[in-house]
Amino acid sequence: MTTLATLIFLVTLLFVLWQPKGLDIGITALTGAFIAVITGVVSFSDVFEVTGIVWNATLTFVSVILISLILDKVGLFEWSAIHMLHASKGNGLKMFAYIILLGAIVAAFFANDGAALILTPIVLAMVKNIGFSKRAIFPFIIASGFIADTTSLPLIVSNLVNIISADYFHIGFIRYFSRMIIPNLFSLLASIIVLWLYFRKAIPKTFDDNNIKHPKDAINDLKLFKISWIVLVILLFGYLISEFTKIPVSIFTGIIAFIFLMLARKSNALNIKQVIKGAPWNIVLFSIGMYIVVFGLRNAGITLILAKILEYISNYGLFSTILGMGFISAFLSSIMNNMPTVLIDAIAIGQSNVHGMLKEGLIYANVIGSDLGPKITPIGSLATLLWLHVLTQKDVKISWGTYFKTGIIITIPVLFITLIGLYLTLIIF
């Protein structure tokens, strides 16, 4: 059974990453899950358990992305980016830092996928219009994609990884935020410093800001633009209310997304059908299918091996526990994708005989490693693969070798500093 469960997992993962002839990841994951069920690797009760675990996470994620797609069509993100350019006042280094800050804000509220896939094309178009060379464009593109993941820690909704882990361990919105806001600030500061050190010679010191258009010119629907701010406030309140009422956060995000869609349906700035079609619905199928496949590893006893490793690491104290878990999840994410990684690690943490603050350290370090680790390799997350594809369509080609060389140098120090932020949070607060 161990061999069969492992084989099903590896083959499913291979096809998810390979996507031959555009094979949808949701179909691939469900096929793997179906094989796992008919071969007896997982039971029907496991299927119901998995559905109960991931439905809230995936629907929340889809709802947030839907909202972000509408905001993108309205022009909110481009409006924000233009403001950042004007605030830079022709200083290239300031512009670099401000773009990173904008990416961090977008990632926090609209998830890492939304930040990377929506903000990157906007930034790319802007630096091209300014007249930057290909060498000068590269740092801004990498920074836009990198910061989307490294600062997707503060809110449960900032990353699908966060939602799944929080749901699995029944962590509320406020409790999660209180533990991850400081690590996220550490990650943001470390990202700015490390990215600047790495790209300092390629970033232009000055640029001509005379031809930058006015922020209001980016707004495609003024009425909907104003409504957007109200939607954002209501969305934040929805997150808080879900904490106290114990109503699944997907209910709030789903209702808000639906109302926003209805308000936007008569706007000339967007096509509602295209927006709905553009939402990552396949993530729902992928999450359920992949989780079922991972449950096969649990049933075969493979996750128990990892649980024993975590118990061993925890014997050396909180600092070693956090660093060990963080780098284990980062490494696994980089070689087999962060979605199955966070699932496997969460199950192993639950199975381990680790309690109290040490267990809390494992839980949050797993999230940090699974959020940041994917930046080491192109296959670390599905969003990165899609991000690279979008860039290729826009005539910006980044080879896997170039990505890996850049990713590993930038990610390791940022990951280490972020984990230190988590350690300080747990021992001080």
Curated annotation (Swiss-Prot):
Any Pfam family the entry gives: ArsB
Membrane topology designation: Multi-pass membrane protein
Any one GO biological process: response to arsenic-containing substance
Domain of life: Bacteria
Record's subcellular location: Cell membrane
A GO MF label: arsenite transmembrane transporter activity
InterPro entries per UniProt: Arsenical_pump_ArsB (IPR000802)
GO cellular-component term (any): plasma membrane
Entry keywords, A to Z: Arsenical resistance, Cell membrane, Membrane, Transmembrane, Transmembrane helix, Transport
TM stretches of this protein: 3-23, 25-45, 50-70, 99-119, 137-157, 180-200, 222-242, 244-264, 275-295, 316-336, 372-392, 408-428
Family: Belongs to the ArsB family.
Function in brief: Involved in arsenical resistance. Thought to form the channel of an arsenite pump.
Protein name: Arsenical pump membrane protein
